[in-house]
């Protein structure tokens, strides 16, 4: 087992019931029955496969098959000068960032009330990890908001953009990418191999049939 940019990789020979796995990872989103009857809501897979391997969501793979033994997702840190954090974490935010960074960096969901500083927490976490970071957004309003916050809290960071035909990602510290572009555009597999941290704003959108196609291109 290994962690790759496409997800948790497991050999098909190590899967006792491939059909059961495929069924478990073919999902149907919740839509209130007042709008659409459940049986008419289409299903879609949240896995990838090749001739020899299945690529499944990271935590599903760990839960079912154990901790991965190798990772191709180790990304070197960039120069600290780009990650100077111009601000301070409030006392209420400290447990949030600590839960991500200690005892060692890992992933999760930042859950704070409106105005609680989720964006600031994410940028602080990025400043501590010091790896190329991509922020996924689904609107130009959020894109502009993130760019403003990056300039304010990481004033020396080099900011990149992914939107439409614009793919400005080389030698960038924080990239703000449109989910629509990344999920729907055909991109070379190596496009985002330099990314070490993925931040998803409004993360409840990422499970949709279209937007879920973005994650295997990034993580």
What do the PLM-derived regions correspond to, one by one?
Residues 24-75:
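Interdomain "pre-motor" coupling segment immediately N-terminal to P-loop NTPase/helicase cores
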Residues 43, 69-111:
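Conserved pre-motif I regulatory segment
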Residues 103-129, 134-136:
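Walker A/P-loop
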Residues 110, 135, 175-177, 190, ...:
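Hydrophobic positions in the central parallel beta-sheet of the AAA+
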Residues 141-166:
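Conserved helix-turn-beta segment of the N-terminal RecA-like "Helicase ATP-binding" lobe
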Residues 165-175:
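Conserved motor-coupling elements within RecA-like helicase/translocase cores
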Residues 180-181, 188-219:
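SF2 helicase catalytic motif II
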């Amino acid at each position: 087992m290994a962690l790759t940019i496409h997800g948790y990789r497991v050999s098909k020979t190590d899967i006792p019931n491939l059909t059961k796995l495929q069924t478990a990872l073919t999902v149907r989103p919740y839509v209130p029955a007042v709008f659409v009857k459940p049986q008419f809501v289409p299903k879609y897979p949240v896995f990838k496969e090749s001739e020899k391997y299945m690529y499944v969501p990271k935590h599903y793979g760990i839960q079912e098959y154990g901790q991965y033994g190798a990772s191709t997702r180790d990304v070197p840190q960039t120069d600290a000068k780009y990650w100077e954090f111009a601000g301070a974490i409030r006392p209420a935010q400290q447990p949030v960032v600590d839960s991500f960074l200690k005892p060692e960096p890992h992933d999760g969901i930042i859950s704070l009330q409106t105005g609680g500083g989720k964006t600031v927490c994410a940028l602080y976490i990025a400043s501590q990890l010091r790896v190329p970071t991509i922020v996924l957004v689904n609107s130009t309003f959020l894109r502009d908001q993130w760019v403003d916050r990056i300039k304010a809290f990481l004033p020396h960071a080099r900011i990149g953009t992914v939107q439409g035909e614009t793919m400005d990602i080389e030698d960038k510290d924080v990239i703000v990418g449109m989910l629509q572009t990344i999920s729907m555009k055909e991109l070379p597999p190596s496009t985002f191999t330099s990314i070490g941290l993925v931040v998803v704003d409004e993360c409840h959108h990422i499970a949709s049939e279209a937007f879920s196609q973005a994650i295997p291109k990034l993580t």
